[in-house]
Amino acid sequence: MNVYTTDRIRNVVLLGHGGCGKTSLVEAMAYLAGMTSRMGKVEDGNTISDYDKEEMKRHFSINTSVVPIIWEDTKINILDTPGYFDFVGETEEAVSAADAAIVVVSGKAGIEVGTRKAWELCEQYKLPRMVFVTDMDIDEASYRQVVQDLQELYGKKIAPFHLPIRENGQFVGYVNVLQQRAKRWKENGEVEKTDVPDYSKENLGICREALMEAVAETSEEFMDRYFGGEEFSEDEIRQALRVNVAEGSIVPVLMGSNILARGIYTLLVDIVKYLPSPEKRTCTGINAKTNEVYNADYDFAKAKSAYIWKTIADPFIGKYSLIKVNSGVLKTDDILFNQHKDVEEKVGKLYVMRGNKPEEVKELHAGDIGALAKLSGATTTDSLSTKTNPILYIRTTISTPYTCKRYKAKNKGDEDKISQALQKLMLEDLTLKAVNDSENGQTLLYGMGDQHLEVAASKLFERYKVEIELKRPKVAFRETIRKKVDVEYKYKKQSGGHGQYGHVKMTFEPSGDLEQPYVFEQCVVGGAVPKNYFPAVEKGVQEAVLKGPMAAYPVVGVKAVLYDGSFHPVDSSEMAFKVAAMQAFKKGFMDASPILLEPIASLKVVVPDKYTGDIMGDLNKRRGRVLGMNPTEHGYQEIIADVPVMELYGYNTDLRSMTGGSGTFSYEFARYEQAPSDVQEKEIEARASKVDRAEE
């Protein structure tokens, strides 16, 4: 592939709801740009972007793909992202590497939850954007409704650039709102000028007014002239658009049909014309040597530096670190320093990815997106630079996974293979986490949703030929007591020769601190138990609390006091007193009104106002306690509640169902509380075989 300078580069991320047409838009762009001889289809599994077997099987995007489109001697790096929320980590990575966005909206489906989330991401990363309305070949599609809904949500910055022309239910042409001229497609795909149809003139007036209003909002001078009834010249409008679209204060709305490849030409032209090249954006890091701010700003003349925004670790194509060059020019065989890993690595060859196909390139200029192969220790969010000028860039914030299932190998002996395969998946996917829960004897897999975990399990089989079973995770309970008891236990064994003797009198009571397993004290007088055996008695308590007598869960919140006992000058030993203390604990615990404690999570749920009643009702069913509500932006409410952890299983799926995908949640462990009696009974019964009872 040819080398492109910074001013001839556009990095554009496609965002939008799942199924709105992002991948088919890429196909239309690639076809129109002459990259392909025919357009692939998502349902046929032959698109440039959706190359993964899981994507082909499921007919939707799972990974972000880079597809460079060459248009008017400009390299447009299109980042095609998943629209489904389970794969939001891929989208967040792509947004961090982009300089602008196209929010794709289906003209038939209209504004969806994914549209709003896409807009929020653009706001978060301060990305200038366009909206492209697809499906205009479908009779039920309404461009006008989409524009109106966008204006209601986001105000006067929404600027419709085009207006569709329909005849007999067919999408046959468009009106250019700026030029107030119409064009019609001929059978060979070319366009010809035509008169604006009479039936379009009213809508043209409405769209023209919206465009002028958006331009007027950009300066006081324009605002005064607009309210004075003065017209703007076409050159003034174009200049205002060039500046303000790039700054994000005007959002153009375009439209077309991906299937017919109509409206794509004007989209590509406007991407080059209005969306900013990297040199128009800012980019800062920290010099690790001096701790000073480093203004990279995609300046090719500065020392070379780059940021790894995504990793591909596929056994079929190898490992590639996808980078964005933040400053300087990277060349073949460069030596780069990874400040995060404190290691220098030789770059070798430079690549540009086209879907899953790497193409060699001699150099990558500041602002360009490329790939490096087989960097040994590099991972996503690492910074690369020279050792003399070590730069650190802010790591991309990736969503925290809260959906959890336990997993185990379907076939015995595959455990090590599964562990290694998961490490490779997690190298690619920062929202996938494997955690060993030794307390409950389980391994847990965290993801963004059930579908995410199912895809991960499927990838393990497709790529690495290992299978896992996903099941509901066990919840870690605790045991404690509610009253004080006095216990005596004498451990005495004689089997000829040297025997064992340990005798303790102890009290056990609630300590009042559920964050500590136990508190140990002694108040022995008269040497009934020699001091040198006190540590052994405490050791007995320490070991006993690891596995409680009720359900074999760890014990918390117990105060143990040794106040009396006896010893034998020959047969007593540390082991004997340790065993005596352990048995005293087990015996006394069951007489001290024991209970099971369950973990409680502090939950935050953010939903639109209209769903708050449903959410609070559902939380009540989950034994939750709503503690408060706080209004947030755009008509949303944050609901704060305490909920038992065991009741949060499946909450991600249920919340999406209740809110149409618009609700989000997060939680963290808060404390342990007494579990209801029915929950305790079930848990005690289920774990009866694990319990060690006290010896008589």
Set out the residue ranges of the language-model regions.
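Structural and coupling elements of P-loop NTPases
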Residues: 1-696
